[in-house]
């Protein structure tokens, strides 16, 4: 699939499922089922509950997506 056709959104991980699958609540309130992209898996980046992530969605099926980036959390100061 070409990169232009993907929809990129941000959300929060609400549930961890088997086989590196996660349930993500997007900023617009929708729930999607997302798996980890290959680069995140290759670099051993851990994704935990409550993490903010970027998710790519296909315009053909808006219920499934791919986690492409884990956003940094700001430390309270």
UniProtKB/Swiss-Prot annotation:
Pfam annotation, one family: eIF-1a
Residue ranges occupied by any S1-like domain in the UniProt entry: 1-72
CDD domains: S1_IF1
SUPFAM superfamilies per the UniProt record, alphabetical: Nucleic acid-binding proteins
Main location, first listed in the record: plastid
Superkingdom classification of source: Eukaryota
Cysteine pairings via disulfide bonds: none
Encoding gene, per UniProt annotation: infA
Name the UniProt record assigns to this protein: Translation initiation factor IF-1, chloroplastic
Record keyword Endoplasmic reticulum present: no
Keywords carried by this UniProt record: Chloroplast, Initiation factor, Plastid, Protein biosynthesis, RNA-binding, rRNA-binding
Location relative to the cell: Plastid, Chloroplast
Subunit description: Component of the 30S ribosomal translation pre-initiation complex which assembles on the 30S ribosome in the order IF-2 and IF-3, IF-1 and N-formylmethionyl-tRNA(fMet); mRNA recruitment can occur at any time during PIC assembly.
Family under the similarity heading: Belongs to the IF-1 family.
């Amino acid at each position: 699939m070409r990169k232009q056709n993907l929809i990129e959104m941000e959300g929060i991980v609400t549930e961890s499922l088997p086989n590196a699958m996660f349930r993500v609540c997007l900023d617009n309130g929708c729930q999607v089922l997302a798996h980890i992209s290959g680069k995140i898996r290759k670099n051993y980046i851990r994704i935990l509950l409550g993490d903010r992530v970027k998710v790519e969605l296909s315009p053909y099926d808006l219920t499934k997506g791919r986690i492409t980036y884990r956003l940094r959390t700001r430390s309270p100061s």
